[in-house]
Amino acid sequence: MISKPDKNKLRQKRHTRVRGKISGTSETPRLNVFRSNTNIYAQVIDDVTGTTLASASSLKLTGTKTEQAAEVGKLVAEAAKAKGVEEVVFDRGGYLYHGRVAALATAAREAGLKF
């Protein structure tokens, strides 16, 4: 019998492969995205020191999932700018740049983050 591939394991492999190529510094931290079935989370991470500079999630937001993702992008951009971060490296977390991930990225760009 043919077994279906585990989507999350494939995503984790993609994420690990990409993480070998990108890294956040104190000047340009990494904007990491995690997407669950119900919520979306975003963090601005300085990989040199291993600290999270800003974060936002859709845990308390309402609306459609795409609208929530756009709001999270706006919130994380505002939090990052409050910490003095203007430019980031976008880490899509192994997800396709489509739908909620793209909505978050677009909203973060519109809120003033450069990537």
Curated annotation (Swiss-Prot):
In terms of InterPro entries, this protein maps to: Ribosomal_uL18_bac-type (IPR004389), Ribosomal_uL18_bac/euk (IPR005484)
What is an example of a GO molecular function annotated in this UniProt entry? structural constituent of ribosome
At the top level, the lineage of the source is Bacteria
As recorded in UniProt, coiled-coil segments are: none
- Keywords associated with the record: Ribonucleoprotein, Ribosomal protein, RNA-binding, rRNA-binding
The Gene Ontology biological process annotation of the record reads: translation
Pfam families associated with the record? Ribosomal_L18p
Assigned GO CC terms:
cytosolic large ribosomal subunit
| Region entry Disordered, spans | 1-29
Q: What are the Basic residues biased-composition ranges? A: 10-20
Q: Which residues form the signal peptide?
A: none
Family per record: Belongs to the universal ribosomal protein uL18 family.
Q: How does this chain assemble?
A: Part of the 50S ribosomal subunit; part of the 5S rRNA/L5/L18/L25 subcomplex. Contacts the 5S and 23S rRNAs.
**General function of this protein:** This is one of the proteins that bind and probably mediate the attachment of the 5S RNA into the large ribosomal subunit, where it forms part of the central protuberance.
Any idea what this protein is called? Large ribosomal subunit protein uL18
Organism placement in taxonomy: Bacteria, Bacillati, Bacillota, Bacilli, Lactobacillales
What gene name does this entry carry? Answer: rplR
